[in-house]
Amino acid sequence: MTQYMDFEKPLAEIEGKAEELRALARANEEMDVTDEASALDAKARKMLEELYGALTPWRKCQVARHPERPHCQDYINALFTDYTPLAGDRNFADDHAILGGLARLQDRPVMVIGHEKGNDTKSRIERNFGMARPEGYRKAIRLMEMADRFNLPVVTLVDTPGAYPGKGAEERGQSEAIARSTEKCLQIGVPLVSVVIGEGGSGGAVAFATANRVAMLEHSVYSVISPEGCASILWKDAEKMREAAEALRLTAQDLKQLGVIDRIIPEPLGGAHRHKETTIASVGAALGEMIAELSAMDRAALITERRNKFLELGSKGLAA
């Protein structure tokens, strides 16, 4: 059953009524509710088009965080074959917020790395809600180095509210680990492609998304800070998150316009959480296209292009 967000309450009522009619028809075979149910379905679709055609930045944040949205493990299971998970940073521990391993994408050997939030209470706690600790970023560095050594393209799937800010993580060098992961992204001489599949939160996302090609799902978000965190700092009031979301320019559409990302992957009507298989297939197609485009480039060209891409960010605005 779909979990509805607050702005979808009118939609929930309509779809609920349609389901009630169908339940009555199933209980009584002589009852024909086809016309009534179809009318409600048409009304619900029209409302979906209106709601998702005019999503505010804050509502996009809500969609990006939807618990039923496909997560990293869903993409790995559906898109990659021969997946062999690799664990540990060879220094402290294995961070379960970060998945990674060898796999094949459309029969091409790759290294896949991503944030995993979990899909129920137990797994969310185990995955730390997708907030990686230093050992997670050091694991990612190890996997990127391995990919570079064996000339494997790297695919990163970004979905995190941010790196974990706990005391232990800070003591073990969280900021250094994020910086080293970002540095490693800039150093490897293989194609590096990244997709923001949900939340792209702060340095925790940048550490994976400093890539040759960066894509975002249509209703995902990518920002230096969460709207709630921004509101708490600027207005001393987390309830100002709507205003903060507007100011942060965190939507895929804004970031494409600003040149921060390279492409937007469309989501089906109603968001990825309503149509998981279609969304996952779209991401797979985009990944294949981006890797194929980059595979013709040699090591030096890949590194130079990636480095220049990020050094030039903001140059148009500064020049103006």
Curated annotation (Swiss-Prot):
* Alphabetized HAMAP family for the sequence: AcetylCoA_CT_alpha
Source species of the chain: Roseobacter denitrificans (strain ATCC 33942 / OCh 114)
Keywords, ordered alphabetically: ATP-binding, Cytoplasm, Fatty acid biosynthesis, Fatty acid metabolism, Lipid biosynthesis, Lipid metabolism, Nucleotide-binding, Transferase
Under which name does UniProt file this protein?
Acetyl-coenzyme A carboxylase carboxyl transferase subunit alpha
For this record, an example GO cellular component is: acetyl-CoA carboxylase complex
Query: Domain of life here?
Result: Bacteria
Its Enzyme Commission number? 2.1.3.15
State how it assembles: Acetyl-CoA carboxylase is a heterohexamer composed of biotin carboxyl carrier protein (AccB), biotin carboxylase (AccC) and two subunits each of ACCase subunit alpha (AccA) and ACCase subunit beta (AccD).
